[in-house]
Amino acid sequence: MRTVKSMLMAVGFVGVVAGALSLPVDAAGTTKVSGTRFEMTIPDCWTPGYKDIDEKLFMIFFKDPKSGAVLEGVYLRGAQPSTFKLADFKKARIAGEDKRYEGKGHKVSKDGTIAIAGENGDYLHTTWKDGGKDMEKHTALYLKDGNRYLVVMSGEKGKVDKKVFDEAVKSFALAKP
């Protein structure tokens, strides 16, 4: 039953994304996709998908059919207390990624601030090896009222178009209630 529910939800989401892709194009070759939590601009013709993991996260993702790079918009469920700051979010993200890529040479090659949703967020560029390939990931972290959001783009090093990530981050906005 759970599998059927997940499949139906996936089909519904793809329909929503496909419908969203028919909206007017923002910049040349891009479309703004809006959801219940956030909106961002994505490249046209990238393959959509989503993950909805019960009480953990909601993610929409788009895969470049040419390079295999993946662009993700993520909402992590569960509001954090007011004492939880952006620095805590960044520290937790790095620790989680270190664990995820353990034994693969995962490292933060660059970190700093980035403008996201009209406010300051944190930026991470990380690298690791996977199956003999050099991989990279660009991550923008955003914390608003205890809610955690990420824009992530990852793929094989040298095949990830950072301009796509930059446009998604620049256009990222919380959904209007």
Stretch-by-stretch model annotation:
Residues 19-27:
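Sec/Tat signal peptide C-region and signal peptidase I cleavage site
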Residues 1-13, 19:
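Bacterial N-terminal signal peptides that target proteins for export
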Residues 27-57:
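N-terminal "mature-domain start" segment
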Residues 37, 46, 112, 127-130, ...:
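Short, well-ordered turn and helix-capping elements at secondary-structure junctions
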Residues 52-138, 144, 149:
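Conserved polar/disulfide-associated segments of primarily extracytoplasmic proteins
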Residues 37, 84-91, 159-166:
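Soluble non-cytosolic domains of exported or imported proteins
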Residues 44-46, 146-177:
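Surface-exposed amphipathic alpha-helical segments
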Residues 39, 139-140:
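Short, surface-exposed charged micro-motifs
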